[in-house]
């Protein structure tokens, strides 16, 4: 499967792969608090400081589960791949933003054709939300994925029931 944007105007795409992972493959990882830049911008937008803006992640600085290599086989036209498992806990809000990939660009020496692929590891649950380029998404199935170009605004939240995290795999890569 290749990641393709139908035209130069397309900013994102959606697709599906059949899940080949189990809950144990990602739920038992040693997730840590994800700290990322951007808080001042969100405070300036009027979001109060008590909001939880970040969930938990398990990234490339840790040993990756064995099944992760299959994603590079499935998405055959990407390179410089990094993986981050993300656990968005209940009452986490990630306001609309653009990822600048500063560290990724530095590490891989690239500036263009950077994409994000978000693989939904579980079926959608009420209160889970994703927005890409001003379009909202709910009701996804495990294996659904969303890919977008690096300059595309996106947002996410988990305002669902307590103890009902949203698990995703974030793939950052260069489109070949």
What are these model-derived regions, one by one?
Residues 90-92, 143:
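Tight coil/turn sites that cap or link beta-strands
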Residues 11, 113-115, 163-167:
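Residues at beta-strand starts and edge strands
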Residues 73-77, 107-111, 138-139, 159-161:
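A general structural signal for short secondary-structure junctions and capping/turn motifs
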Residues 87-89, 106-126, 172:
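Short, conserved beta-strand element in jelly-roll/cupin
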Residues 80-81, 96-116:
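A short beta-loop-beta micro-motif enriched in histidine and acidic residues
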Residues 6, 88-89, 133:
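A structural detector for beta-sheet-dominated domains
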Residues 123-176:
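Catalytic core of Fe(II)/2-oxoglutarate
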Residues 1-85:
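Non-heme Fe(II)/2-oxoglutarate
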């Amino acid at each position: 499967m290749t990641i393709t944007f139908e035209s130069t105007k397309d900013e994102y795409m959606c697709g599906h792969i059949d899940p080949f992972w189990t809950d144990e493959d990602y739920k038992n990882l040693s997730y840590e608090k994800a700290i990322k830049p951007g808080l001042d911008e969100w405070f300036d937008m009027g979001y109060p400081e008590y909001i939880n803006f970040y969930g938990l992640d398990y990234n490339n600085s840790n040993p990756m589960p064995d099944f992760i290599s299959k994603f590079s086989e499935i998405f055959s036209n990407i390179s410089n791949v990094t993986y981050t498992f993300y656990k968005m806990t209940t009452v986490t809000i990630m306001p609309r933003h653009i990822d600048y990939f500063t560290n990724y660009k530095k590490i891989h020496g690239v500036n263009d054709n950077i994409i994000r692929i978000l693989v939904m590891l579980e079926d959608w649950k009420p209160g889970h939300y994703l927005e890409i380029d001003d379009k909202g998404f709910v009701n996804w199935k495990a294996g659904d994925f969303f890919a977008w170009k690096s300059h595309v605004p996106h947002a996410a939240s988990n305002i669902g029931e307590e103890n009902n995290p949203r698990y995703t795999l974030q793939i950052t890569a260069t489109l070949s």
